[in-house]
């Protein structure tokens, strides 16, 4: 989710509930998934919605090959430059909530040259197809900022170490703390769903999107034209971390940069 959706921790659940339920959900919801059906690219709202919902179903059933190579952040690095795709502008310093991020160079490599930069970013990052921001005064941007490495973790139940070369699709890591376990359980519970709605700004129903959360440290690229659904390595920066904004770019400028 994510460059990414912004997530807030939910009310902590009792530990005796979290571990068995989380384990069951991971096994039920946990081979690199097959790409979505190939064919001529279409971008009508109904086609995009169908493509996106298929990606959620695919991401929810994990296989051993989900455990693929990830971008590792060496333990000796103190600060890391990250980016987030958002309609809410620059994040506050310190961060007011957990923020999903990726490495700007890896994201730019996949979106460069795409005719629709916003849609390309949404597909690469595993975000729902949203042609316009939720409020008229908002604008989609990519914010690049610097954070301490120690404030980052991989959203991976098999291990959250950002220096690891991959996540595992087997058992839960014994090193997960209560806060991270609750965060990951919330991701699974709120990601694997379709067909839900919520009241929009005009009082009418709007989609309450799920997400193709892989739980394996990489985003699900739901672009049907992509050779693989493996997107980019994704990370989460914890609430309260200091964040120094380096640049705010339009999606078009970010994806078109050399």
Please identify what each model-predicted range represents.
Residues 26-29:
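C-terminal motif of bacterial Sec signal peptides marking the signal peptidase cleavage site
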Residues 164-258:
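Active-site or metal-binding loop neighborhoods of secreted/extracellular toxin and effector enzymes
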Residues 3, 84-85, 146-148:
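Structured loops at beta-to-helix junctions and adjacent beta-edge loops in soluble globular domains
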Residues 95, 105-163:
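ADP-ribosyltransferase catalytic core
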Residues 1-14:
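N-terminal secretory signal peptides that target proteins for export/translocation
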Residues 34-102:
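ADP-ribose/NAD+-binding catalytic cleft of ART/PARP-like enzymes
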């Amino acid at each position: 989710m994510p460059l990414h959706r912004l997530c807030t921790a939910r009310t902590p659940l009792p530990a005796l509930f979290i571990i068995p339920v989380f384990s069951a959900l991971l096994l039920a919801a946990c081979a690199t998934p097959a790409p979505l059906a190939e064919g001529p690219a279409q971008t009508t709202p109904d086609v995009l919605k169908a493509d996106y919902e298929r990606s959620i179903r695919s991401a929810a059933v994990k296989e051993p090959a989900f455990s693929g190579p990830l971008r590792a952040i060496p333990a000796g690095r103190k600060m890391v430059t990250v980016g987030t795709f958002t309609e809410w502008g620059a994040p506050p310093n310190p961060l007011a909530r957990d923020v999903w991020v990726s490495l700007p160079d890896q994201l730019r490599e996949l979106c460069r040259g795409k005719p629709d930069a916003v849609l390309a970013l949404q597909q690469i990052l595993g975000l729902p197809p949203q042609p316009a921001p939720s409020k008229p005064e908002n604008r989609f941007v990519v914010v690049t900022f610097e954070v301490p490495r120690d404030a980052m973790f991989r959203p991976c139940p098999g291990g959250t170490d950002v220096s690891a070369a991959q996540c595992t699709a087997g058992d839960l890591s014994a090193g997960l703390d209560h806060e991270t376990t609750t965060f990951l359980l919330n991701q699974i519970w709120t990601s694997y769903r379709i067909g839900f709605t919520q009241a929009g700004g005009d009082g009418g129903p709007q989609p309450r999107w799920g997400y193709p959360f892989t739980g394996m440290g990489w985003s699900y690229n739901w672009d049907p034209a992509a050779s693989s659904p493996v997107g980019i390595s994704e990370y989460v920066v914890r609430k309260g971390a200091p964040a120094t904004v380096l640049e705010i770019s339009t999606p078009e400028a970010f994806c078109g940069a050399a």
